[in-house]
Structure formats: structure tokens, C-alpha cells
């Protein structure tokens, strides 16, 4: 069985190859690893070298950037940006319209409210139940 790829140009003029994920039909880079049990909404993107674990849900319009890791059972709402090389721990829940910064880390089971910004290099070790800017918890080393 052959796979059909789509080439999309990024902001640097580079072409990346994407295929539609079997669950949800979202765009998944040819070099990313997405578990077959994960669900990627049709308007979501998973960029090169990103990983999405089993049973994860990536909402409509969300963007998982290069090298990011989304753990098993994670729920990511609509229109979320997960930054480059960010880590989202198993079972975490990320509300809609949220930005997770580059290299940020959300530990297992955390809940991040909708409309929240987590800064670059931040480590979130407790849930952020209200919308807003979440910084200063513990800088990544």
C-alpha cells in the first residue's frame, strides 16, 4: 500500500513532507513518530522529529513543533502551539488557545488552563487552573 505525501514550505523556504495520520487525518511530518492510537484532528500539524504517544489527542488547529514530545494519554485542545523540543508528560491536559514555549516541560498529569502562555524553558510542576501567563515555577537547567 502506497502513502501519499504533501510537501509544505515553511517560513525558511524549506520543504517538509507530510502525510495524513490514520486517526483524524491531521498532517504528520514524514520524520515524526505518532502512535497509531493517537488522534490528530484534520487541521492539526505534527512537525519533523516530534513524537506523539499512545492515546494522545491533538485538537483542531494545534501545532506540535519540531522535536516536541507529547506523552501517552495527553489531551491538547484546539489551537494550541507546543514549542520546539517541549515535553508534555503523560496524561497532561492542555486547554485550547494555549502556547507552550520552546523547551518547556509539563510534568505528568498536569492541567494547563485555556488561553495560557507557558514561557520558553519553563518547567511546570503544578496545575495552572486559571488562564494567564505561567512563568517562574522552575527554570529548566
Question: Whereabouts are the PLM-identified features?
Answer:
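Extended, small-residue-rich solenoid/repeat segments and analogous flexible loops
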Residues: 1-63
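Glycine-rich hexapeptide-repeat left-handed beta-helix
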Residues: 2-27, 72, 77-141
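Alpha-helical adaptor scaffolds
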Residues: 47, 53-54, 59-61, 65-73, ...
Amino acid at each position: 500500500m502506497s502513502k501519499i505525501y504533501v510537501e509544505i514550505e515553511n517560513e525558511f523556504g524549506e520543504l517538509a513532507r507530510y502525510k495524513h495520520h490514520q486517526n483524524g487525518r491531521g498532517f504528520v511530518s514524514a520524520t515524526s513518530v505518532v502512535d497509531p492510537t493517537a488522534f490528530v484532528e484534520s487541521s492539526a500539524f505534527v512537525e519533523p522529529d516530534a513524537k506523539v504517544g499512545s492515546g494522545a489527542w491533538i485538537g483542531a488547529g494545534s501545532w506540535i513543533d519540531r522535536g516536541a514530545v507529547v506523552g501517552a494519554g495527553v489531551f491538547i485542545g484546539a489551537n494550541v502551539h507546543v514549542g520546539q523540543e517541549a515535553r508534555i508528560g503523560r496524561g497532561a491536559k492542555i486547554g485550547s488557545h494555549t502556547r507552550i514555549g520552546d523547551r518547556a516541560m509539563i510534568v505528568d498529569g498536569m492541567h494547563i488552563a485555556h488561553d495560557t502562555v507557558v514561557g520558553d524553558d519553563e518547567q511546570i510542576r503544578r496545575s495552572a487552573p486559571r488562564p494567564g501567563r505561567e512563568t517562574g515555577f522552575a527554570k529548566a537547567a
